[in-house]
Amino acid sequence: MPKVQVVNMQGSPVGELELDEYVFGIEPNTHVMHQAVVGQLASQRRGTHSTLLRGEVRGGGRKPWRQKGTGRARAGSIRSPLWRGGAVLFGPKPRKYGFSLPKKVRRLALRSALSSKVNEQKLIVLEDLSLNEAKTREMVKVLQALNVGKKALIVTDEFMETIDRSARNIAGIKTTAVEGMNIYDLLNSDVIVMTKAAVTKTEEVLA
């Protein structure tokens, strides 16, 4: 079973924690992680792009000149896709890009991402994370004590407004509850900071 050091908010070690091997100790499946990231980013696309086809563009109903005898190439409409100001051929229309993955695949992707962070020693487990008031400077002190870099994801067992508001104005820092964890944020963060309670809840959800 993988083990990680548990630290307090001052960055001092206070013990060790054995992690569930099924959640934090598997061989990361890069293909599944890629699928999950592509699926998440695709679902965020608005897909509102639209072009005018030949039947939608204004004008062009009359033949511009007679078929024969002018010496020019034959033309049936001034809105042909070949013409300047003409319609678009096979252009994009509004559509949904999102696709859903099976629940097992989504969970495997999360377990793979968490395991990869453990392998890279980029998982920090906090004994507890509690602030008296929602102040950015208080969160900055904690992050500095933990030696967290520019991009980090803070995961708590449940939504905590003081934590969320304290980290909101810090560039590169995101906060989430266990239920809101997603593959993109996990992989896009240099460090994952999880409370001990969040680790326990994650193991319950993904086990």
Curated annotation (Swiss-Prot):
Region (Disordered): 56-76
Domain of life: Bacteria
Composition bias type Basic residues, residue spans: 60-71
GO cellular component: ribonucleoprotein complex; ribosome
Biological processes annotated in GO: translation
Stored InterPro entries: Ribosomal_uL4 (IPR002136), Ribosomal_uL4-like (IPR013005), Ribosomal_uL4_dom_sf (IPR023574)
GO molecular function, a single term: structural constituent of ribosome
UniProt-listed Gene3D superfamilies: 3.40.1370.10
UniProt KW keywords: Ribonucleoprotein, Ribosomal protein, RNA-binding, rRNA-binding
Pfam families for this protein: Ribosomal_L4
SUPFAM superfamilies, alphabetized: Ribosomal protein L4
Subunit note: Part of the 50S ribosomal subunit.
PANTHER family attached to this UniProt entry: 50S RIBOSOMAL PROTEIN L4, LARGE RIBOSOMAL SUBUNIT PROTEIN UL4M
Role of this protein: One of the primary rRNA binding proteins, this protein initially binds near the 5'-end of the 23S rRNA. It is important during the early stages of 50S assembly. It makes multiple contacts with different domains of the 23S rRNA in the assembled 50S subunit and ribosome.
Family listed: Belongs to the universal ribosomal protein uL4 family.
HAMAP family, per the entry: Ribosomal_uL4_B
Protein name: Large ribosomal subunit protein uL4
Species in which this protein is naturally found: Desulfitobacterium hafniense (strain DSM 10664 / DCB-2)
